[in-house]
């Protein structure tokens, strides 16, 4: 089965995240935050793109969920490699679900000035 998810976000929503550490830590892991610091370019665009990626994955997984699982946005980690491609690292119940269902997850993120968009495809 294949499923897709897509999310678009206004980049401006994330300006205050850089000034509010608690807000940043509510949605992003320490590893993600460190990854933002290493990245060149706009940190705000990167924040928005990774948030959109998390939302896209939730949308893609929702038709596959046969029962409710408990997860938070920090259980879905989005890390960009040195090559520039973003990848999901899942934790806790959502990771167990992905392993049990033998899911392959594909992600692409793009941002342009005011908007960030992410597209996810899931197959098993």
Swiss-Prot record:
Annotated Mg(2+) binding lies at 7, 55
Cite the InterPro entries for this sequence: 4-PPantetheinyl_Trfase_dom, 4-PPantetheinyl_Trfase_dom_sf, ACPS, Ppantetheine-prot_Trfase_dom
Task: Enumerate the catalysed reactions.
Answer: apo-[ACP] + CoA = holo-[ACP] + adenosine 3',5'-bisphosphate + H(+)
Q: Which UniProt keywords apply?
A: Cytoplasm, Fatty acid biosynthesis, Fatty acid metabolism, Lipid biosynthesis, Lipid metabolism, Magnesium, Metal-binding, Transferase
Lineage top rank: taxon: Bacteria
What is the predominant subcellular site recorded for this chain?
Answer: cytoplasm
Q: What class of enzyme is it?
A: transferase
Q: Give the Gene Ontology MF terms in alphabetical order.
A: holo-[acyl-carrier-protein] synthase activity; magnesium ion binding
Keyword Metal-binding, does the record have it?
yes
Instruction: Please cite one Gene Ontology biological process associated with this protein.
Output: fatty acid biosynthetic process
Subcellular location per the Swiss-Prot or TrEMBL entry: Cytoplasm
Entry EC number(s): 2.7.8.7
Its function, per the record, reads: Transfers the 4'-phosphopantetheine moiety from coenzyme A to a Ser of acyl-carrier-protein.
Similarity section: Belongs to the P-Pant transferase superfamily. AcpS family.
Q: What is this protein called?
A: Holo-[acyl-carrier-protein] synthase
Source species, please? Borrelia garinii subsp. bavariensis (strain ATCC BAA-2496 / DSM 23469 / PBi) (Borreliella bavariensis)
- Annotated gene: acpS
């Amino acid at each position: 089965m294949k499923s897709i998810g897509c999310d678009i976000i206004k980049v401006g929503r994330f300006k205050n995240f850089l000034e509010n550490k608690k807000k940043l830590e509510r949605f992003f892991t320490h590893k993600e935050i460190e990854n933002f610091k290493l990245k060149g370019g706009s940190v705000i665009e990167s924040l928005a793109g990774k948030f959109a990626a998390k939302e896209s994955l939730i949308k893609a997984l929702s038709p596959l969920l046969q029962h409710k699982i408990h997860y938070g946005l920090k259980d879905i980690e989005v890390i960009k490699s040195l090559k520039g491609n973003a990848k999901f690292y899942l934790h806790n119940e959502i990771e167990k679900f992905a392993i049990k269902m033998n899911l392959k997850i594909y992600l692409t993120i793009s941002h342009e000035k005011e908007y960030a968009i992410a597209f996810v495809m899931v197959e098993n």
